[in-house]
């Protein structure tokens, strides 16, 4: 038998590879797009939903149903007030919106943008108090009114944490509900009612009970579970989930308070975004998904997650494992809802909260001016701080400081460099001037300025009168100073002040996470834009 000589194809493979490489280079130089995606999906075939973070647990059911009807469903989650901003800026990317409360659809600049809105389930926003604390206050198995909560706060017997009034749905609707009830539960809240001095004093007293504020509802849950707090305001379904976790760990659950004179109820509407009214197939897909969300199977699924679907929240046959009576949840009682005011009144009420009602804050910004910040980094820092501190700029996004707020600036490199302070939170011209003349140089030490910030807050701030926050921005690894010095100071002084951090450049996130874990805080990503990061962290104080 004669063996045939095997051909060597290696040279041919090399030649073909070279030709393909040459082809790609030439086409790229011509500016053509070579996106050969084997999993390519026509954008027109995708059904995009912009949805509240409160619905994220239901994503897979919606996506699976989309597959059943031949629709590729993509869901993006944001905070409710952020959804309003996104849709006002550009709604063309989305086909439907699932938001926590219909009032935010009314806040859209284009009142004709959404159609076919229907409530899917309802979700009250209430206060949960450790049951032993609620018993001591006389709230267990009793009719509780909003004035009872107010009196407990005034007497120093009740403190709580909540999410931002100006950046989250739970914060905003809880505020509007309490505002409405303290105004005497009128048929409709008016602008004139917002001018009542007694009402303003009651609201200031209510917010004096705030210990911490979160910029989003999800982090509020983490803050509570990781901290030493005994009350919080949140969604009913979230408080149920928290109680399930607490009891599974052998810890004391929260007792939910439903004031008989009114609670904030969210109707969670699912609505069509009519960007292209001629696309009948798209609208048909929307109607199918909406009908599925309102189907018995999905309603049962959502009830098991702690959402209600019954008129007035009443259902004597509700799942008692989820809607546990021992946690203060009584589904045989009608929930007294409020009628939300007009768009104009809501806007005025939010501005009133910022300027006059919320508990003042003292924020210490620790700003890295080490040598690595030279150039673009320092320029971005100056722009971001000017935006946050300038009243006119910040007020466009409801981020402005009020007259009663305090602001301190600690600049640092390998040591604390300078300290600047404001007497009034809305008079920041001198601080902005000093920031814009900062020079970069030296090494990086994030620990000494953090201790300095805590010292400033301890020496100048009363916990009962102010919320306290440290915001640290750095672009590098701390090569001097010691984390253990911060840890020692924090524990010796029984600190509870959050130390938030913003990453930039080549900052060492592990060092920043240590500070966040120590103080029950979090780290924000400023690498894609310092201005956006400072805006986000601002909503946490």
What are these regions (language model features)?
Residues 9-12, 30-34, 311-364, 371-379:
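Acidic, polar low-complexity linker/tail segments
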Residues 37-157, 161-164:
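N-terminal segment of the mature folded domain
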Residues 126-133, 266-284, 301-305:
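A bilobed periplasmic-binding-protein/Venus flytrap-type ligand-binding module shared by bacterial periplasmic
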Residues 166, 290-314:
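Periplasmic-binding protein-like
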Residues 186-258:
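Ligand-binding pocket segment of bilobal, Venus flytrap-like solute-binding proteins
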Residues 251, 474-525, 535-537:
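VWA/integrin I-like adhesion module and closely mimicked acidic/polar interface patches used
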Residues 356-421, 427-473, 501-511, 532-533:
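Von Willebrand factor
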């Amino acid at each position: 038998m004669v063996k045939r000589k095997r051909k060597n194809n290696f040279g041919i493979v090399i030649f073909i590879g070279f030709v393909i490489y040459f082809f790609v280079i030439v086409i790229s130089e011509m500016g053509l797009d070579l996106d050969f995606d084997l999993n390519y999906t026509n954008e027109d075939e995708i059904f995009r939903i912009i949805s509240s973070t409160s619905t994220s647990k239901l994503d897979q059911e919606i996506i699976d149903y989309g597959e059943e009807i031949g629709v590729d469903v993509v869901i993006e989650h944001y905070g409710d007030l952020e959804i309003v901003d996104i849709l006002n800026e550009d709604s063309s990317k989305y086909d439907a919106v699932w938001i926590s409360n219909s009032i935010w659809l009314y806040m859209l600049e284009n009142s004709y943008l959404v159609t076919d809105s229907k409530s899917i389930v309802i979700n009250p926003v209430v206060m949960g108090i450790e049951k032993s604390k609620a018993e001591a206050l006389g709230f267990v198995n009793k009719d509780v009114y909003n004035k009872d909560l107010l009196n407990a706060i005034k007497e120093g017997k009740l403190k709580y944490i909540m999410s931002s009034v100006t950046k989250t749905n739970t914060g905003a609707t809880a505020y509007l509900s309490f505002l409405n009830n303290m105004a005497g539960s009128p048929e409709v809240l008016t602008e004139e009612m917002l001018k009542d001095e007694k009402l303003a004093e009651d609201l200031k007293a209510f917010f004096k009970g705030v210990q911490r504020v979160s910029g989003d509802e999800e982090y509020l849950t983490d803050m509570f579970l990781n901290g030493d707090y005994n009350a919080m305001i949140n969604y009913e379904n979230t408080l149920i989930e928290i109680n399930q976790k607490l009891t599974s760990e052998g810890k004391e659950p929260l007792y939910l308070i439903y004031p008989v004179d009114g609670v904030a109820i969210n109707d969670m509407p699912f609505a069509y975004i009519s960007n292209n009214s001629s696309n009948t197939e798209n609208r048909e897909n929307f109607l199918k998904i909406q009908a599925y969300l309102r189907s018995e199977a999905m309603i049962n699924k959502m009830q098991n997650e702690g959402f209600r679907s019954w008129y007035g929240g009443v259902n004597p046959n509700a799942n008692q494992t989820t809607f546990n009576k021992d946690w203060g949840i009584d589904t045989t009682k009608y929930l007294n809802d409020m009628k939300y005011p007009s768009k104009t009144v809501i806007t005025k009420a939010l501005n009133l909260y910022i300027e006059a009602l919320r508990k003042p804050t003292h924020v210490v910004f620790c700003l890295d001016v080490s040598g690595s910040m030279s150039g673009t980094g320092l320029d971005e820092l100056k722009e971001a701080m000017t935006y946050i501190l300038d009243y006119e700029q910040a007020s466009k996004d409801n981020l402005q400081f009020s007259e009663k707020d305090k602001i301190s600036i600690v600049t640092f490199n390998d040591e604390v460099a300078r300290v600047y302070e404001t007497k009034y939170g809305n008079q920041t011209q001198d601080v902005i001037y000093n920031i814009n003349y900062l020079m970069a140089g030296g090494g990086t030490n994030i620990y000494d300025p953090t201790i300095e910030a805590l010292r400033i807050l301890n020496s100048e701030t009363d916990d009962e009168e102010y919320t306290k926050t440290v915001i640290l921005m750095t672009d590098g690894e701390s090569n001097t100073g010691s984390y253990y010095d911060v840890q020692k100071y924090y524990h010796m002084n029984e600190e509870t002040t959050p130390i938030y951090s913003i990453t930039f450049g080549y900052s060492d996130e592990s060092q920043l996470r240590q500070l966040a874990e120590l103080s029950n805080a979090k780290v924000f990503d400023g690498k894609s834009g310092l201005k956006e990061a400072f805006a986000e962290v601002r909503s946490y104080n």
